Amino acid sequence: GGAESADAKKKKKKIPKKPSYVGAVKCNGSCHDAYYEAWKVSPHGNTFNLLKVGERAEAKTRVKLYPEKDYTTNPLCLRCHTTGYKQRGGFKPAGSKNKKGKDVSSTIDPEEPNKEQVGCEMCHSVAGGAQMRVVMKNTKGDFAKADTEKYGQRWDYANVCTRCHTHPK
């Protein structure tokens, strides 16, 4: 067994070491349509909207923010009010550019919320990559808890929630 040929190496599928965020819209149109529709009108499905000028003025004032200010590009806010901010495949605010200067800002569609809100992946697991492919192939949905953990499902909800739900009152 010598070294692999260049052609053989190219044929091998590359599976990213770190999964990439895919967004809540990937859950819609699959087995989770009802969950997606319920999420869209839930508090998590509207977190980014709270950062806009004039939204939740009383709550912003209570935590010493300015209701007339736009917080939709503020990094401190985006880490909890979006999906995967500053992570692979995660939300990119308006004005985001890649190394070549190309605009890579996330698309925002009010009719089909996605990474600009707190989506499924923020609580359950990052869905892109090898993990998602394995889960999607098992259409029976009969995973044991250990299997779901192996593919990234989070069960320590108290720790997951407190990453964001510790904002001062």
Annotate each PLM feature.
Residues 6-117, 121-155:
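Sequence context of c-type cytochrome heme-c attachment sites
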Residues 119, 160-161:
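Short beta-strand-alpha-helix junction that forms the catalytic/metal-binding core
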